[in-house]
């Protein structure tokens, strides 16, 4: 999608350029609010978290920010003290150029791990950036944060007079354990810091934290939201609903663009003892290489789903005799379908989005997670990815 001026939140501007970090495409994105924002961020729990994560986590502790720096094609992870110094220098340079206090800036970085930033190029490219800020171009920003993505990822909604927009990137090294790959949300709605924090974290937990491409949690996962309040207050419930819709849209875009992916997998587990159990079982299914390859081959092999459920060894209250497995609405376990239904099941498994539904019949809680199939393309892309 492309945003029009009428669908763009007011009071934001951007500076987007190529600094030569890896190639000739946009690799530096700066998004600024005209006024200080209520803000929140959630980040990777990886033990190898990069300086961008640690700095942003610190800067957002007070629930305020006015700008976000996003660098693509280089994660700046595992570079020791020099990597920390480089990230801090970039924040200081942007602060000097824009007049925003360094502590009111967040930074995110994505790309190859273990390479230092080309800091001389970055220094040169940021000279005069404060005078080059233009009306916010969220479409270009979504393209500028891409690495191995094949399409940009953007979504928007309106609540009353306020607009919300979200951009994200990610196709591999994706099983968020806090937040997401990289995702950024901007709104001109007025909202308190505590309310924003509650809504944002609930949204992330039920969308991005329910996404898995390859079970690998990134060292750079970051999700940040800025709300500048210029459009005034909006109903909290409507704001929360709109934010969740945007996040859900972005999750599906990421799943569709998973490295080598041809299909989205949606797994819903219901009748669980609690939400955590439902989510654990659903994740076990969507993460299974055998389930993923069965989906790729349009093979309705429900035994692989049963296997994935069975791996959840800590869920001692799951009784196989009570479990029901469906592909779409067709029940495959207990095995009640006839041989003539096999073609129908193959049709279901051939869709661009394959729905797997499991009922545990223990309690009342439900969780839905998303992923994609596993193909030769994933191996090819990652086998050739240069360090």
Swiss-Prot record:
<feature type="binding site">
    <location>
        <position position="147"/>
    </location>
    <ligand>
        <name>substrate</name>
    </ligand>
</feature>
<feature type="binding site">
    <location>
        <position position="382"/>
    </location>
    <ligand>
        <name>substrate</name>
    </ligand>
</feature>
<protein>
    <recommendedName>
        <fullName>Arginine biosynthesis bifunctional protein ArgJ 2</fullName>
        <ecNumber>2.3.1.35</ecNumber>
        <ecNumber>2.3.1.1</ecNumber>
    </recommendedName>
</protein>
<feature type="binding site">
    <location>
        <position position="259"/>
    </location>
    <ligand>
        <name>substrate</name>
    </ligand>
</feature>
<keyword id="KW-0068">Autocatalytic cleavage</keyword>
<feature type="site" description="Cleavage; by autolysis">
    <location>
        <begin position="179"/>
        <end position="180"/>
    </location>
</feature>
<dbReference type="Pfam" id="PF01960">
    <property type="entry name" value="ArgJ"/>
</dbReference>
<dbReference type="InterPro" id="IPR016117">
    <property type="entry name" value="ArgJ-like_dom_sf"/>
</dbReference>
<comment type="subunit">
    <text>Heterotetramer of two alpha and two beta chains.</text>
</comment>
<dbReference type="GO" id="GO:0006592">
    <property type="term" value="P:ornithine biosynthetic process"/>
</dbReference>
<dbReference type="GO" id="GO:0004042">
    <property type="term" value="F:L-glutamate N-acetyltransferase activity"/>
</dbReference>
<dbReference type="GO" id="GO:0005737">
    <property type="term" value="C:cytoplasm"/>
</dbReference>
<keyword id="KW-0511">Multifunctional enzyme</keyword>
<feature type="site" description="Involved in the stabilization of negative charge on the oxyanion by the formation of the oxyanion hole">
    <location>
        <position position="111"/>
    </location>
</feature>
<comment type="function">
    <text>Catalyzes two activities which are involved in the cyclic version of arginine biosynthesis: the synthesis of N-acetylglutamate from glutamate and acetyl-CoA as the acetyl donor, and of ornithine by transacetylation between N(2)-acetylornithine and glutamate.</text>
</comment>
<feature type="active site" description="Nucleophile">
    <location>
        <position position="180"/>
    </location>
</feature>
<keyword id="KW-0028">Amino-acid biosynthesis</keyword>
<keyword id="KW-0963">Cytoplasm</keyword>
<feature type="site" description="Involved in the stabilization of negative charge on the oxyanion by the formation of the oxyanion hole">
    <location>
        <position position="110"/>
    </location>
</feature>
<dbReference type="GO" id="GO:0004358">
    <property type="term" value="F:glutamate N-acetyltransferase activity"/>
</dbReference>
<feature type="binding site">
    <location>
        <position position="169"/>
    </location>
    <ligand>
        <name>substrate</name>
    </ligand>
</feature>
<feature type="binding site">
    <location>
        <position position="387"/>
    </location>
    <ligand>
        <name>substrate</name>
    </ligand>
</feature>
<comment type="pathway">
    <text>Amino-acid biosynthesis; L-arginine biosynthesis; L-ornithine and N-acetyl-L-glutamate from L-glutamate and N(2)-acetyl-L-ornithine (cyclic): step 1/1.</text>
</comment>
<keyword id="KW-0808">Transferase</keyword>
<feature type="binding site">
    <location>
        <position position="180"/>
    </location>
    <ligand>
        <name>substrate</name>
    </ligand>
</feature>
<dbReference type="InterPro" id="IPR042195">
    <property type="entry name" value="ArgJ_beta_C"/>
</dbReference>
<comment type="pathway">
    <text>Amino-acid biosynthesis; L-arginine biosynthesis; N(2)-acetyl-L-ornithine from L-glutamate: step 1/4.</text>
</comment>
<dbReference type="InterPro" id="IPR002813">
    <property type="entry name" value="Arg_biosynth_ArgJ"/>
</dbReference>
<keyword id="KW-0055">Arginine biosynthesis</keyword>
<dbReference type="GO" id="GO:0006526">
    <property type="term" value="P:L-arginine biosynthetic process"/>
</dbReference>
<keyword id="KW-0012">Acyltransferase</keyword>
<comment type="similarity">
    <text>Belongs to the ArgJ family.</text>
</comment>
């Amino acid at each position: 999608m492309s945003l029009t001026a009428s669908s763009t939140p007011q009071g934001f501007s951007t500076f987007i350029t190529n600094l030569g970090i890896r190639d000739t495409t946009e690799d530096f994105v700066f998004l600024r609010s005209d006024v200080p924002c209520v803000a929140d961020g959630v980040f990777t729990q990886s033990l190898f978290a990069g300086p961008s994560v640690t700095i942003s986590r610190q800067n957002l502790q007070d629930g305020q920010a006015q700008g976000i720096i996003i660098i693509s094609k280089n994660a700046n992870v595992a570079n020791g003290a020099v990597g920390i110094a480089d990230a801090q220098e970039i924040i200081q340079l942007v602060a000097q150029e824009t007049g925003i206090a360094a502590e009111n800036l967040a930074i995110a970085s994505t790309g190859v791990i273990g390479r230092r930033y080309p800091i001389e190029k970055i220094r040169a490219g940021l000279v005069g950036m404060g005078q080059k800020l233009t009306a916010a171009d969220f479409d270009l920003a979504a393209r500028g944060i891409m690495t191995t993505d094949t399409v940009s990822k953007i979504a928007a909604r309106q609540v009353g007079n306020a607009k919300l927009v979200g951009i994200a990137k990610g196709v591999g090294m994706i099983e968020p354990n806090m937040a997401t790959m990289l995702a950024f949300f901007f709104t001109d709605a007025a909202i308190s810091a505590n309310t924003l924090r509650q809504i944002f974290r609930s949204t992330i937990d039920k969308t991005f934290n329910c996404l898995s491409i390859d079970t690998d949690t990134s060292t750079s996962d970051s999700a940040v939201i800025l709300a500048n309040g210029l459009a005034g207050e909006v109903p909290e419930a409507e704001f929360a609903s709109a934010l969740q819709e945007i996040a859900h849209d972005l999750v599906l875009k990421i799943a569709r663009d998973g490295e080598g992916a041809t299909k989205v997998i949606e797994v819903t587990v219901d009748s669980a003892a609690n939400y955590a159990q439902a989510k654990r079982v659903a994740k076990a299914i969507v993460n299974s290489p055998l389930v993923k390859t069965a989906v790729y081959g349009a093979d309705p092999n429900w035994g692989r789903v049963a296997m994935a459920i069975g791996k959840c060894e800590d869920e001692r209250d799951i009784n196989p005799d009570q479990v029901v497995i469906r592909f779409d609405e067709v029940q495959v376990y207990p095995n009640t379908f006839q041989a003539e239904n096999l073609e129908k099941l193959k049709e279901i498994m051939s869709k661009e989005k394959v729905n797997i539904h499991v009922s545990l019949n223990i309690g009342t809680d439900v969780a839905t997670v998303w992923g994609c199939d596993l193909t030769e393309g994933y191996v090819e892309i990652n086998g050739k990815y240069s360090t």
